[in-house]
Each structure stands twice: as C-alpha cells, then as structure tokens.
C-alpha cells in the first residue's frame, strides 16, 4: 500500500507545483489532532484510549482530493471509502474521551484521509487541478486497520518525525 501511495504522491509532485510531500514512512490517518500537551496528560490520554474496543477491519483508499477544495488545493489527499464508518465510530470514541478530559470539541467535520502533499505555491496549479479532476475516483487499494496510536509529532527542518506514545490494538486493548 505504501508503494501505491508513494507513486500517487510522486505523480502529484511531477505537476511542478511547489509543495512539501509526505515521506513514505509518515503516511497515516489522523483521527484527532490534539496539539501540545504535557507528558502526564499524554499518559492519561493513552490510558483512556485503552478503553476503545474494535475488531480488525479493512479500509479502502480511493479518490484523490484536496482541502479546502480541488480547484483551490492546499492539502492533497487520498480519501477513505469502505471502512470509513468504522473509522468514524472510533474517532467519535476518541472525541468523547478528549472532551471528557476538558479538550474543546473538534469544530471541523471528520473526513478520513491520507495526506500526500501540502501545497506551497501557485506555479503550475492548473496542472494539479486537472490531475485532481482526472483522479477523483482512483482506486488505491485496501489495508487492514489493526491498531490506533497516540503519536507525538516532533517537527524538524527535514519534516516531522512521529513517535508512538501509546497503541491500542484491535480485539484487545493495551499500550506498547
């Protein structure tokens, strides 16, 4: 799956639009961005996430899209088709846990996706918009979801480094 996402990302990069692409090892689906928190709060979040129960399931990655919209792309992504409902259910559990801890409710609607690139300029933008139109229904493939993870994002000049703090596995719970 990573190879397919990488080839799609590379096709986007070949449009010549200034962008920052996501490295292969950083492809992921964000259920909820939390922001900066202390280590004790992160530990409490991890412990509470352990209450989430789910079975392994598959998600279908399909459709190239962009935020805020395809004709004004700032973030280019691959969407989730099949399995999106189960992702939403898990995300709702995460949201319930966070709001019970005093975090503000997420204002934006949840659109499960894998980010491929962040657009940094307008040069050659029509080529990217055309590609987004042509690949709006592209089928990338399916992947099994077997865990959810609380990640720390460490920002560097070379790009983010993601470190797993806690992991909840399907059909059981616990942290790693």
From Swiss-Prot:
Listed transmembrane segments: none
UniProt short sequence motif HXTX 2, positions renumbered to this chain: 113-116
Active site positions: 28 (proton donor), 113 (proton acceptor)
EC numbers for this chain: 3.1.4.58
Motif HXTX 1 per record, residues: 28-31
Lineage: superkingdom: Archaea
UniProt keyword Hydrolase present: yes
Free-text function comment from the UniProt entry: Hydrolyzes RNA 2',3'-cyclic phosphodiester to an RNA 2'-phosphomonoester.
HAMAP family (UniProt xref): RNA_CPDase
Family membership noted in the UniProt record: Belongs to the 2H phosphoesterase superfamily. ThpR family.
Name listed for the protein in its UniProt record: RNA 2',3'-cyclic phosphodiesterase
Record organism: Aeropyrum pernix (strain ATCC 700893 / DSM 11879 / JCM 9820 / NBRC 100138 / K1)
